[in-house]
Amino acid sequence: MSFLPGEPVPPGFEEDVSRTAVIQKQIESYTAGPLIGTEYTIELHEPAQLRPNYFCVLCQTCSDGRNVFVHWTSQAHRTKYLQTHFQKAYKELQKLKRTPNSSGDLVTATGNLVKCIEKHFGRSRNLITATGDDFRRYRSKMCSQVRDSFHFDECAGSDFSEEAQRVIRELKPDESIKSSMKKNVDGTGDSNKQHDDGNIIALDAISSDDESFGGSTASVVPVPKGRQKNNLSEDAGGRSKNQSPPPAGGVNKTQHLPTPKELAIQASKISQERYKWEKFRCMLEIQLKQLRSDTEMYESNPEKHPDYPDEWKQFWNRRYKQLQEEKKCDPNQYDYKPEWISYWKDRRIVLFDIAVNKIKKDLKEKFKLGDEDEEKTLELMERYKIRVASPRRAPATTNSDNCRKTKPNFRNNRPIVATSKLPDAVIDISDDDVDSPPSRSRHSHKRRSISRSLSPKRGGRRAVRRSRSRSPRRSYNRGSTRSRSRSMRHRSRSPAHYRGRGRGREPASKERGSSSRDFGGRHSLQRERERSSEYYHRNEGYARSSRGYESVETFRVLDSRVYPEYKVTKTSSISPTASSNKEKEKEASEPIEEGPLTVVSVLRMLSAVEEHLGSLGPKALNLLSKALAMELVKPNAAEDLLRNEDNCVFLETTKEKLKGILIAEVLDDPQKVRVIKKLITNIAEIIYQATFKGTNDAVDVKVKANANPAPIQLPFDRNLVAPKLANALVLNGYNNVSTGDMNNLLHMLTLLMKTDKQRRQLDNNNGLKFEEIKVKLGLQNNPSPDDMGIDLDELMKEVEHQLHKESVDIVNKPTGAPAKVQAADTVGGSTGLESLTDSDLQTLLQNFKFLSNEEQVHLIGHLRKLEVQDPSRVDRLRKYVNLVELRGDGESCSDFLARVVKIGGASKAKPATKFKASVMGGRTSSAMAASSASATAPKVGHSMLSAQRPNLDRDMSSMPINKQRRGRNTPSIMLDDDDEEDDDYNFDDLVMKACDSNGSASAGGGGGVVGAGVHNKPGVPPIIGVESSPNALTFKPAAATKISLKDTENIIANLMGTLSKNGTSGGSPVGGNRNYMMNQQHGAPNAQNAPNLGQNPGQNLGQKQPGAGYSNAGYPGQQQQQQQQQQHGRNFGQEAQPLMSGLSGGPNANHYPNQQGYGGYHPFAGNGVQQNYGGMVPPGPGGYVGPPPNPWASNVPPQPPFNQMPQNFMGAQQQQQQQQPHFNNMFGGRH
């Protein structure tokens, strides 16, 4: 596509503008000869050359601008083009090679033929331009583009075979052509006048239009010259005695009967004519169908129309000139697109009509048909008939008055026919023509006599039907026998025809009277019958109109009546009801395909209608390939594709698109409609099957998943607590703790963090709130006001029970889950919770303690129902229940919640006894003095605990939680699964031994333990210990090193005090790691006094060292609180402290001689430096002003002090009293 400079590009071709060829103008102005195949040339531009090169793709040769025209006019280029696109004409030209000295003639003939082609098609101007580099890089692509472009071809028009023959004849006919011309010359007379061409043997030799019919067929039916002379003499001099008188118009020439071969030739000619028209209609319908589809494409993409650029150019030039003449606006700034769109819509219709006419014209030229849109079969029938006895056909020029004057005398009618000058004679071998003698008219009386000479031998059979008295001078000459035998042969070939014609005969007088009048009407009617589909079933009328030809229909070689119809049958003539009934009958008659409905079968049917799916077609094929690949791996594995939600959405989308196709009625083929309907049904069915199967499979999968539960997950991240635990161990001198001991301690600490309101509502009278552990570890900023404490022993026993139940459930998993699912329908009742989702139930379970009693009861009932209906769902919800690891795994979720509610009610209804509270309070606070008590304190505490143990056990056994667990005798389950070795000491023993070993120290410090518990705040549950039991919590330390009970006690006690932090501390793992590193750096000077694992840390920690103790690490400004403790006898150094004594808030400030205001966390022990972020008091003797960064705090200005101690210690009269410094050896000296 090339445009002149300044000429705009058609809309849609802005990015498709190619460079105009330099040689284009020279091609248009070249007149030295015809040019063909120029579109095969590519113009190549090199950067260093002024003139481009030209590469011919057809010949694979390269030339420059000076000799490219020589190449285009060469014999090789032209021959190659003809051989590629005009093969028929090329074969005709190759005949010249067989004759000697024909090389020059072949070149001339080729030039003349190329000239004809160029005159017909025009000169091609589509040259492609490219740079040399692009051509060398994309040579194959460009060559393919050139070959696939439009070329003049015999398929697009005439094949030029006739032109090639004409060129050869005009140039130099060869000897074979001359000999064939000589064979066509007739030796009897003047018949050579009608053969002007000489090389075509025409069938006109048997035509009755030529008066020398006998001469042209002398070779077929030889007649002696004497015979001809006798006939001429008889015709000229008079009539024989057996003949009727000659017509008055003149002398008739002799005619002979056609042979079967001649009749077969004329039948073949007619059949070929019909075949040509049938093929013409077929080809026309095919090409028009393609043209219609292209036109539909051009409606949406007009720029793809081949005439679009040229039409735009013409439109623009014409409109541009009009705007210039109008001078109303600037033509260069004018918007031509709106006018062009409307113009192109009309122009496209015109171009379609032009294309249709061109297709018709080309097909008629190809099949050598006439310009009329009708067959010439009837004309051929009239042309190739030899009329002898048939009166049916009379020319339209016959006088109607003479035809109506029919007389019985045969001779009276002869002048009428003689004056009409009929051009053909018809051979009538029928017996029925004798019934109409008045209307018979003949050229030759001899032929009439020959026809009537059959009557004497048939007299016995035909005497009833015709009279023999019409011609008294009948004679039997030599031709009668031959005529009769030939007539009998013709009659015997189609007996059915005569029977049909005899049945369909009308009265002779009526038909003869209307023959001349209705000739034109019957002729037009005959054409309509020829085109109609019912014509061949009603050929009796044709038999009545032309009897003389019907006898030779058995010689028809190519009969179009037995050919299949190429064009699509039109349904417009059929009523919609009839068509719909036929479709229903077809659907009912077709067998329905039986077989299992699978994903592969549905996708296979989808691939069959891929062309109607549009962009969804490739996706369907891709899914089919995946399904087949999965089927190869495992049978029926393709069904798993429907478990993917994206695949189900794709199938739903495909189904809706197919429904849209049916609704829009864009499909004409009823078979495709049935396929799409079936597809829609199958897609819906497999999606339903997948959904139904997915629900059943989900239950089975959940039941199987419960057989292998996930390992126990800790409630908090290990990285959150591990650095703080390691820091506490290092500060206390335990540098060689094994990995197993670390894991055991870490697991125990994290389990302690999991608390719940209902599980901790045991006793609110005494003890320390267990929620403070979260606060001190940085896991919770502020404790909830309504949180209650929890009994430590009950906590541990619940952990043991829960772990044991989990292991038992893993070993003995019930297999009755399907039965429970089936029995779900039998569970009645509804509380309105059936519509809740898993997310709603999760929220309710996590906030179970905030629900009212009625809501809790309803939720428990609903969970009981779910345990029967859907056990897997309840197991999935178990992880959302708080303290899920503190209950038995064999115990259902609803039973656990019910027990929690029962325990809470029992705790509220019956509080603990005062004696029990005092014991718990004493044991809870006794951990504070575990490392600083005197030698007499353990004996007092041990004797007190031993005296009170029976009562304590009796009271604990009467509690609801112990009543429920009394009958359970389950072995202890190891918390840590990493170590394979185990030890048999448990947490109960650890607590009891801590009380036995450290109780005397606290007793010696001051005060009785029993009396101290009277002043505790009621409602706070104490932390107590019980005897060792088989269900005790078991640890598994490393085999190499073992920690003694007292070491473990001191580690945990020191940890709880060391991990205390400011109110603003975030408790992040980063701070813990930083603290751990700092202690590692400063631990070397203190390592000399570090105790080993087998030594009691209290022995070394009992020595006083000035400035070596830690201040209160968790609660700034608590000096007043610590002063209150001495007045009430509740100093933490006066009681036997259990393991968790560090939770009380740190060491007593009165134990230190150089007590300063609380300043935060010491960088290292023993330096006497304390940073006071609150009051900024002067530093100690060995300190300095200027606080370093605190690794445990957030290093922001401190918040107001937070008082965590019980309120009954805050007496105003006791805040001014101070106690002598006392060293608390719990934190130890300088290590």
Curated annotation (Swiss-Prot):
List of residues that carry Phosphoserine: 449, 451, 453, 455, 573, 589, 972
Biased composition, class Pro residues, residue ranges: 1178-1203
GO MF, any single term: transcription coactivator activity
Record field: compositional bias (Basic and acidic residues): 503-541
GO annotation terms (biological process): positive regulation of transcription by RNA polymerase II
Chain intervals with Polar residues compositional bias: 1076-1103
Modified residues (Phosphotyrosine): 549
Region described as Disordered: 171-197, 210-259, 389-547, 570-591, 950-981, 1058-1203
Biased composition (Low complexity): 1118-1127
Composition bias type Basic residues, residue spans: 440-450, 458-502
Protein name, entry field: Uncharacterized protein CG7065
Keywords carried by this UniProt record: Phosphoprotein
PTM annotation (Phosphothreonine): residues: 970
Organism of derivation: Drosophila melanogaster (Fruit fly)
A GO cellular component annotation in the UniProt record: mediator complex
